[in-house]
Amino acid sequence: MTLTSPPRTRADSRHSWVPAAAGWTVGVIATLSLIASVSPLVRWIIRVPREFVNDYIFNFPDTSFAWAFVLALLAGALAARKRIAWWILLLYMVAAVGWNVADLLTGDESVVEEMGEVIGLAFHLAAVAFLLLARPLFWARVRRGALFKAAGVLAAGMAVGVLVGWGLLELFPGDLERDYRLAYAANRVFAFAGVDPDAFDGQHPHVVVNALLGLFGALALMAAAIVLFQSQRSENALTGEDESAIRGLLELYGKNDSLGYFATRRDKSVVFAPNGRAAITYRVEVGVCLASGDPVGDPKAWPQAIDAWLALCGTYGWAPGVMGASVGGAEAFRAAGLSAIQLGDEAILHPDSFRLSGPDMRAVRQAVTRARRAGVTVRIRRHRELSPEQMAEVIAHADAWRDTETERGFSMALGRLGDPADSDCLLVEAVQGETGGERSDPGSGTVVAMLSLVPWGSNGASLDVMRRSPQSPNGTIELMVSELCMQAEDIGVTRISLNFAMFRSAFEQGAQLGAGPVARLWRWLLVFFSRWWQLETLYRSNMKYQPQWVPRYACYEDARLIPRVGVASVIAEGFLVLPFSRRNKQHTGHHTSAPQDLVASGVLHHDGTAPDMSGLRTDTADDEPPRLPEQVRVRMAKLKALQADGVDAYPVGRPPSHTAAAAVDSPDDVELDVAGRVLRIRDYGGVLFAQLRDWSGEVQLLLDNSTLEQGSTADFTAAIDLGDLIEATGTMGYSKNGTRSLLVRHWRLTGKCLRPLPDKWKGLTDQEARVRARYVDLAVNTEARDLIRARSGVLHAIRDTLYHKGFLEVETPILQQIHGGANARPFLTHINAYDLDLYLRIAPELYLKRLCVGGVERVFELGRAFRNEGVDFSHNPEFTLLEAYQAHADYHVWIDGCRELIQNAAMAANGEHVFLRPRDDGVLEPVDISGPWTVKTVHDAVSEALGEHIDAATELPTLRKLADAAGIPYLTHWDEGAVVLEMYEHLVEDRTEKPTFYKDFPTSVSPLTRPHRSIAGVAERWDLVAWGVELGTAYSELTDPVEQRRRLQAQSLLAAGGDPEAMELDEDFLQAMEYAMPPTGGLGMGVDRVVMLITGRSIRETLPFPLARPR
């Protein structure tokens, strides 16, 4: 995936071509000079134009490695728009103008020579003019470096080169006069053959000698350049204060960045956002400023850090590039004008879901088994747990087992081991023949492999070093990774970042069946280069652990710079090692990049350890407080004022002596105290009235300055807002208008309400707001409290009724391996401890029947069930379900039993046997439900609705014809029972009002019900329906295990065929049934729907906290 953005450029100019043209021109001369110094053929081919250029335009000796090297550096600097290169070229051109003018003024030149001088003068004047006009385009500076040290190396190198060259000329002088040999050597070594050879008497020395003299100068220049470039990196590397600031940012914001800790690698440089809350670490290679990973720090400050980094790139003429950015980081760089391309994927393991079981982990499982059989055990320690001697041994192993001369890595490697600042790093060792068994016990075995992982936030680890001895058994690495995941909980690790797999998608796509020729060719190339760079090996070593793949991106400014950024990345990561690169050298910079105010605060440490976090939070992480409504801000200010005065706004509670309702009925001379929420306040100066509500009711408080023992009513007004919780103590009495009131002597605040209550008269009028803020609805709305009481009364009445009949209440599992007991779509979840998919139960039926088999003759469960179905006024995904089973009974027994349960519940909630039903005007009116209820068969009820007689023997074509006539849809694969059930639901259930029992359902739609004892084709089952809502169902339970198995197998076939509501085959339940269950009548009742009809409200209104769609 590639994210592109418009390229960032400075203001365009008519002379923008000058830097590139100057660089190319000088570069061509440098290239030709180098080739001519090596090849006599090329030197002969370009002799004539070279001599013209050398005489009149630009110094171009026949052989000079030194001059070629100088010009190469100058060409690169000009192309990079370095200001110092502009000055050098300008001064050279100005000097050349002077030389040409001087030669013309002497007047002793031939006509041809004068023409050459004029051409050269014109070229130099034009070059000076264009360079002056293009001066603003050469803005780039040069980084600080050890300039004097480099100059000393250059001087010493040149001196040695001149002396060696002088000696060489003494040995092979040709016809060169002795007096000129030293000067000739100096001209060739450090004057770049700038003096005309004709100035020296005698014939020139052999061309090989000239080439060697130029090579001596080139070597001196190279040595000086190497010293300068290396000093630039070391001078500008991280200082202790920089590293300390980075560690502080990582502690504050680094919990999501698996590569964040690698920002402390000490051969990197750093640039901070101006506010110090974010930073970017980078390294400069081949003119590319290569940032490693995401910015470190507050994501809100990433744009400022990126802007500072890009400004730095512009200052020094570097091309910006990024290696290993995450999706969020790539988006941030893209917003700053860079483009991004997916580089590969990082392998993330989650130990809580890591298992060696399963076919996908077979290879790892077998490798682990082999390693264990070889006697390998794993030891895991923090670096701080190792003694200096033990750490020295670890470092020795890491160096000895490294398969390259230098350590690789840049964006995903730390580059050091054993530093005291890295004490939180993890060390995982594979030990062969170890006798110790503890995690941190050094044991007595031989270490054969090791992993070192750096911290990833507070609960993660990111792989830094992986080493194994050539003598380690096969499977050692797999064993270490597996044991790390298995023991992760003990060491506080919840996520592990393994190696980075570059071009992972290319390997996968190229290996797929039907991959195109381009994909296969690209994969072949990657496999070919993997012989040296281990691309495929890293991919396969990660893939076998079944990790989560997290994409990482490379960012660049312009598509033309992709090859250059790629080369810089290859050099930085260590795949291409340049001479004298000193990758293993630890740097400590000399110029702190952290903001000066942060350095001056004193929180940073010189040794690079994490800073004082309290000071760092104050200085760098002071986020703006969230914007709050005005009333909330006022209340917050009042809370702070109270706390400043020593008032505890949230004290420890103490039970009040009376409820509000009891206080109203108490005698006047009894001192009492009440507690509740203030709903209204009326202030009349020295007298104040407040309405206090608790769960029992309301009481009016009367505060009078003359009766208050301490403080005044003004103190109450200043401290208390509507909604606050208070305690008040006093005696009962009457106000002047005769209202029964608590005459308050003293009071205290027990809970400050920081958000205003809704309108004191209307309350919460929006139904959605009432659902989402039920706590507020309960605080201000007596109707909401009545519904809570009614629901509690219904549950209590159901339990009491069953208890009095001798039923035993039990609890069965909510998490179930097989969904059964009803035809419904289940919720699926997963248990990490057993790596097992589970269902939230749709019904407790199958477990309750197991209890019946065990001899529990009267049993019930009143609890929660879950069905992943629609939500409406009568359906909720999570609901309360009653299931009860009575041995030696049938479904007829439960007709009276169910009616009694509901009537008792109605009595508990409403005080009489009534349902509340809304009239046309919305007012609820009671509907009597006392006495017996109507009982009908399903076929009789459908016949009444159709006007045509049907029964269990009616054939399918006839039923379809009747359904078509009634406009009832059906599916072609349905049998007779399913068609009858569909007509029943549309024509009977939806139109039923008074509570009615519909019995004897078709057998095919009742898989857990026994067949009717006398009527073929129907089952002993009834449904209770009232006002279009199914309230309950009861069965004469199927106890025949053979028939039960046949029906459940049919259901399992439907489930295998894609029916999400069909029950799965529960073999354990079937085995239980084979031990024989007594004849049993079972009842299932939806308690939420019963409460709904008793109270006249929807299910959402009767539930304290119904499921609400996210805002």
Swiss-Prot record:
InterPro entries, alphabetized: Aa-tRNA-synt_II (IPR004364), aa-tRNA-synth_II (IPR006195), aa-tRNA-synth_II/BPL/LPL (IPR045864), LPG_synthase_C (IPR024320), Lys-tRNA-ligase_II (IPR002313), Lys-tRNA-ligase_II_N (IPR044136), Lys-tRNA-synth_II_C (IPR018149), NA-bd_OB-fold (IPR012340)
Membrane topology according to the record? Multi-pass membrane protein
Give me the comment on cofactor binding.
Answer: Binds 3 Mg(2+) ions per subunit.
Q: Which domain of life is it from?
A: Bacteria
Q: Which residues does the annotated region (Phosphatidylglycerol lysyltransferase) include?
A: 1-612
The record's DNA-binding region positions are 674-747
Which residue spans traverse the membrane? 18-38, 60-80, 84-104, 118-138, 152-172, 209-229, 308-328
Put simply, this protein is called: Lysylphosphatidylglycerol biosynthesis bifunctional protein LysX
Binding-site positions, Mg(2+) 1: 1023, 1030
* GO BP terms: lipid metabolic process; lysyl-tRNA aminoacylation; response to antibiotic
Show the catalytic activity: tRNA(Lys) + L-lysine + ATP = L-lysyl-tRNA(Lys) + AMP + diphosphate; L-lysyl-tRNA(Lys) + a 1,2-diacyl-sn-glycero-3-phospho-(1'-sn-glycerol) = a 1,2-diacyl-sn-glycero-3-phospho-1'-(3'-O-L-lysyl)-sn-glycerol + tRNA(Lys)
Which cofactor is recorded for it? Mg(2+)
Family of the protein in this entry: In the N-terminal section; belongs to the LPG synthetase family.
Residues the record lists as binding Mg(2+) 2: 1030
Region (Lysine--tRNA ligase) residue spans: 613-1111
Q: What is its EC number?
A: 6.1.1.6, 2.3.2.3
Q: Which GO terms describe its cellular component?
A: cytosol; plasma membrane
NCBIfam families under this entry? lysS_bact (TIGR00499), PRK00484.1 (NF001756), PRK02983.1 (NF002821)
Intracellular or extracellular location(s): Cell membrane
**Principal location class:** membrane
What is the role of this chain? Answer: Catalyzes the production of L-lysyl-tRNA(Lys)transfer and the transfer of a lysyl group from L-lysyl-tRNA(Lys) to membrane-bound phosphatidylglycerol (PG), which produces lysylphosphatidylglycerol (LPG), one of the components of the bacterial membrane with a positive net charge. LPG synthesis contributes to the resistance to cationic antimicrobial peptides (CAMPs) and likely protects M.tuberculosis against the CAMPs produced by competiting microorganisms (bacteriocins).
Keyword annotations: Aminoacyl-tRNA synthetase, Antibiotic resistance, ATP-binding, Cell membrane, DNA-binding, Ligase, Lipid metabolism, Magnesium, Membrane, Metal-binding, Multifunctional enzyme, Nucleotide-binding, Transferase, Transmembrane, Transmembrane helix
**What Gene Ontology molecular function terms does this protein carry?**
ATP binding; DNA binding; lysine-tRNA ligase activity; magnesium ion binding; phosphatidylglycerol lysyltransferase activity; tRNA binding
